[in-house]
């Protein structure tokens, strides 16, 4: 039974389509949707990390991540979770901030740690190759290869 659906969301059109597909599954199985946004760590060149700048850079990175988190949570609540609630679908949102692991690894670990039954995510079309080619982005591919639960990738 599919009762816990993880929906990694990055704001792209493909992620918006994935919301619609997750909604179908949640309705069919009386499931809940957990939106997940991963904020990647911001790499800083070693040449910039000198003396007192290290503290300032760390504080600035935390400040940027916090603003991204607040903005995404506001968007998730106003545009996604409230719409799902209007359709009687239970939903929540979570943000993961900067880690040594990749976004795909964080998604897979989160799914395992939270006993997710299914992951539904957008494919992230590779625009620079051709607008006619629908290809998997690296995060979707890696999640589909590593996840222990079923993964539905939406084009």
Model-found features: residue ranges?
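Alpha-helix-centered segments that form part of catalytic cores
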Residues: 67-78, 82
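Generic structural signal for helix capping and beta-alpha/helix-loop junctions
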Residues: 42-43, 101, 128
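Small/aliphatic-rich secondary-structure junction motif
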Residues: 1-62, 89, 146
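General small-molecule cofactor/ligand-binding pocket signal
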Residues: 36, 92-96, 152
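Structural beta-alpha unit
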Residues: 78, 82-119
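Gly/Ser-rich helix-loop-strand patches that form or flank binding pockets
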Residues: 111-155
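Histidine-centered beta-alpha loop that forms part of the nucleotide-sugar donor binding/catalytic region
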Residues: 10, 96, 123-126
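Active-site phosphate/pyrophosphate- and oxyanion-stabilizing loops and adjacent acidic/basic residues
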Residues: 23, 108, 141
């Amino acid at each position: 039974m599919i009762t816990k659906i993880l929906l990694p969301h990055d704001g792209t059109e493909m992620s918006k389509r994935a919301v619609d597909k997750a909604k179908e599954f949640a309705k069919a199985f009386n499931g809940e949707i957990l939106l997940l946004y991963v904020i990647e760590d911001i790499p800083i060149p070693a040449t910039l990390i000198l003396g007192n700048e290290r503290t300032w850079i760390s504080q600035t990175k935390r400040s940027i991540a916090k603003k991204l988190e607040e903005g995404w949570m506001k968007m998730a609540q106003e545009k996604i979770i409230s719409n799902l609630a209007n359709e009687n679908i239970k939903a929540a949102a979570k943000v993961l901030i900067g880690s040594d692991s990749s976004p795909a690894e964080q998604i897979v670990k989160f799914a395992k740690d939270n006993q997710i039954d299914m992951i539904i995510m957008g494919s992230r079309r590779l625009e620079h190759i051709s607008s006619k080619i629908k290809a998997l982005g690296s995060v979707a591919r890696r999640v589909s290869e590593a996840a222990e639960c079923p993964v539905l990738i939406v084009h």
